[in-house]
Amino acid sequence: MASSENKRELILTRSPGRLMVSLSLPAIVGMVVIGLYTFVDAIYAGQLIGVDAMGAVSIAYPFTFINSGLAAMIGMGSASVLSRAIGARDQKSIDQVMGNLVVMNLVLSLAVTVVGVAFARPLLALTGAEGAMLDLGECYLRIIFLGSLFVNFAQSSNMIMRGEGELASAMGIMAGGAILNMVLAPVFILALRDQGLGLEGAACATVLSQAVLAGVMLWWFVKREKTARIVRVAASRAVLAEVAKVGVSAMLMQVLTLVQQAIIYRAAAEWGGAEWQVLFGAALRIQSFAFIPLWGMSNGFQPAAGTNYGAGLYDRVRRCTVAFSLGATGLALLFWIPAMLFPEAALSLFITDPALVAQGVDDFRVFFVAYLAMGVMVMGITLFQSLGKGGLAALLALARPLLLFVPLVLIVPNLGGLGIHGVWLACAITDGLLALIAVALMVRTCRGMWKGRARTAAIEEGEAARA
């Protein structure tokens, strides 16, 4: 407990800039390695199997957000409860966090496995996929859904480690699982490729590495003497409700990304055909990977914002918000510049046909141009989650795939004969508008905290004067 107290004091006293580096750097490095899970699967599929396999992994990828969404809801919600409880020294809530997490994982993962395996093909058909791409995607996705419990428990419990401030250990464990997958995937693909099961081999490698990772996380919370431990597997209604309230926005962000990407693939099929689905598959993989460092920084921001807010240090919350938002924008710049300068090289990671790559270069630049503003958007969602303001976080989560993108993708391709090029443009406009909304909500929230602090100080001064 002494080490937990020391970490709490560092979060409450260290300068925001230094805090950003110390909390975020391990998370960024670890999550980049973690992101190589699906990124490498797509590269291996395209380079070792073929274009149809690359397309199959791409259309299946959005549906993996079902598990990512559940893990995010359970993990981010629980981590928010934990960090605020640590800040407020609420030991009862701290002791209940892991029991709730285990129960939620067991129930929700079982449901996803049953439904996902049964309805994998109809789900994939929603993207407009046909023929070999649909058949391969179905086999791949069913195997991924069979590993739901492993990936959900591993990811959500890892978020608890981060909520405790154990960022280096959390990222090291997740990175180990990702490296295992990168080693196993080509071995399984090459071993099964001649039997026509190369893509199934990639899926099996992913599930096996996630199972190992889940076992390590279980050992950590059962055997290690940490702030949050698995002592009693039971659900507390109060903690469960708070986890759901805060975590639903994290789940919405993931699940509605599924909706957005499914709509993109459907629009690509209608306006362009299978080749444009493959191009969008490569572009979305690159964008998703570029988002990962931003979410890594958000993992450092979450305990900083939540712990300071729980301790009533509202000015530090504001200063940390500014520091992390600037840092996230700088981080986004590191990905934005190469994407703008070398789009051919980026697309060629997944696509071996030079003519197809050349076909998508200009549209890829348009698609990626608004990514530069996404760091602020991610910090905004994390801020609202950390403060327990699930409604604002949910608003941002809903805005991107539904409130903004759906009307734009219906309108823009029909303007001036843009067609398929309008689908790419609709994605960029959506992200630009979302960043503006996030900034406005963050400014309003920080001003509200400042005014609330001023009112509290005035009341306390008045009571002191009367006494």
Specify the residue positions occupied by each region the protein language model found:
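Short alpha-helical transmembrane segments in multi-pass integral membrane proteins
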Residues: M1-S24, L82-L149, L180-V183, V187-V248, ...
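N-terminal transmembrane alpha-helices
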Residues: I11-I49, P62-G77, V81, L106-T113, ...
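Transmembrane helical elements of multi-pass membrane transporters/channels
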Residues: S22-D41, I143, G177, S209-L213, ...
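Helix-terminus/linker motif at the lipid-water interface of multi-pass membrane proteins
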Residues: L36-M54, L124-G131, V187-L197, V255-R285, ...
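Alpha-helical transmembrane segments of multipass membrane proteins
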Residues: F39-A42, V114, P122, S156-I160, ...
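Interfacial/gating helices of multi-pass transporter permease domains
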Residues: A45-F65, G131-L136, L199-C204, V239-V246, ...
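Small-residue-rich hydrophobic transmembrane alpha-helices
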Residues: M54-V114, V151-A170, L279-I337, L341-P343, ...
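Short runs within selected transmembrane alpha-helices of multi-pass transporters and secretion channels
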Residues: G75, I144-R162, A170-A178, A202-M217, ...
